[in-house]
Amino acid sequence: MEDDCDIIIIGAGIAGTACALRCARAGLSVLLLERAEIPGSKNLSGGRLYTHALAELLPQFHLTAPLERRITHESLSLLTPDGVTTFSSLQPGGESWSVLRARFDPWLVAEAEKEGVECIPGATVDALYEENGRVCGVICGDDILRARYVVLAEGANSVLAERHGLVTRPAGEAMALGIKEVLSLETSAIEERFHLENNEGAALLFSGRICDDLPGGAFLYTNQQTLSLGIVCPLSSLTQSRVPASELLTRFKAHPAVRPLIKNTESLEYGAHLVPEGGLHSMPVQYAGNGWLLVGDALRSCVNTGISVRGMDMALTGAQAAAQTLISACQHREPQNLFPLYHHNVERSLLWDVLQRYQHVPALLQRPGWYRTWPALMQDISRDLWDQGDKPVPPLRQLFWHHLRRHGLWHLAGDVIRSLRCL
């Protein structure tokens, strides 16, 4: 039987759509299947896009892309139950933007359609179609759609890939649950509250006592007329906790360092999303095969650097490697096992460099000291530095030495040594 197209891609998220666009640009016929009626309506991310990979895909993206604000203000806050120590910086030349996936994804799909991609929203893929051990299409209801190659870009919850035995379910330690809320706030209030002007944006990251005693982090990004607020906590830790995930977000919003930032806001959106932040060691051993390959969150290519989570830009970078693989494979008449070529292209990409660079960070972030001891230490030191009571402030070295010993010098030293080895 003849193929319906060269490439079928399951999932019109950032990775799937970018891969489709590149393949179509090279002259391949591409069918992009999306289960949502509107692309982006089922996609959730923190909301910060590093645009280097987008610029390679669409050099003139800034003319039409629905970007929110250019991130120029950065801060990292270490929270204790009732206090905070914050490190902040101003970077006017930053090349990252806040985005809302409900607006960004439809735009990216439209750009892909301009290159000839056929996108079918509201399409449910029930199974992969296989012949003689090779994936050569998909089954949608009573219909079989055939293609030379199939790309699985179905997200972190890779139901089809797991059902067909292409990958195994990831360990709980390798997955996190992100809970996000979009809050409405007038533009003038956002710019006044976060000290912004001229379409500037702020990225506020939080660590410490966010998810009670659980490891985790949180974020707040400014958009044009909304705030993106959320927490991220390891799935394995959540399953051991008796606190519902939604309650953790509620407690975070009530923290004295967060509450003033979100006052007089109204909730517009709320959702949860699995985040594959296990890094290099959580990637599937075999992420491509006879007629198929994985891309995006299905590839588990999200990278937690410790102070940021790089998801969307890594999805775009991985999509480039996937498209290169498919374009090369389609030049051969006989079907190809995609893994050798795909692995070669991934290893030559920025994605692989970043994955290797931060491969030990997930294990490092499991150490409880980062969430308990270090925030408390920084708060104690800063409090004593600013204390102007009736007693003279002790020498700085004496102050540091006192608090280091009180919080456990050797445990702190162990954290530092492991960090230096990892980073």
UniProtKB/Swiss-Prot annotation:
- Single GO MF descriptor: oxidoreductase activity
Give the E.C. number(s).
1.5.5.-
Q: Any idea which positions bind FAD?
A: 7-21
Gene Ontology cellular component? plasma membrane
Which coenzymes or cofactors are required? Answer: FAD
UniProt keyword annotations, A-Z: FAD, Flavoprotein, Oxidoreductase
Any Pfam family matching the protein? DAO
EC category? oxidoreductase
Family listed: Belongs to the ETF-QO/FixC family.
Function text: Probably accepts electrons from YgcQ/YgcR and reduces a quinone.
What is the official name of this protein in its record? Probable electron transfer flavoprotein-quinone oxidoreductase YgcN
The taxonomy runs:
Bacteria, Pseudomonadati, Pseudomonadota, Gammaproteobacteria, Enterobacterales
